[in-house]
């Protein structure tokens, strides 16, 4: 992101406007896949990141207290990056239905086709501190196993080793 910000500031306003009309404008930004169990705060993490989201004012988008669960995925186009907010269901080891698996595979194919290598620049893994504190060892182990499987699948899909950024949410509620 620092490299992107540096080059963006070197352009004149007219050059920046023309550049935003191109496909490269989105593809050159860093892309992050945001994953985590249901209710871990993935959408809130993005929404409260302090990023300036493009067209937010135009479409009347504003912060809400209860964002609710993400169905399949949401795309967040920010000034300096792109976030793909995924459904918490995608991490379940044996609970992902056929429709969810198809949606995930379609998303990964689209990213790989339109973005080329590396596809995504990193994975933001969001875990709930309250859940980590109160879950049984068996539950934590099950989620850890599911995370490992999904991270290996993503590395295989995007044909690269991806950095994983761990975020612990809801620390203020402990």
Residue ranges and their predicted role:
Residues 86-92, 130-135:
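Conserved P-loop NTPase mechanochemical-coupling segment
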Residues 2-91, 118, 170-172:
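Conserved G1/Walker A P-loop phosphate-binding module
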Residues 98-174:
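Conserved C-terminal guanine-recognition region of P-loop GTPase G domains, centered on the G4
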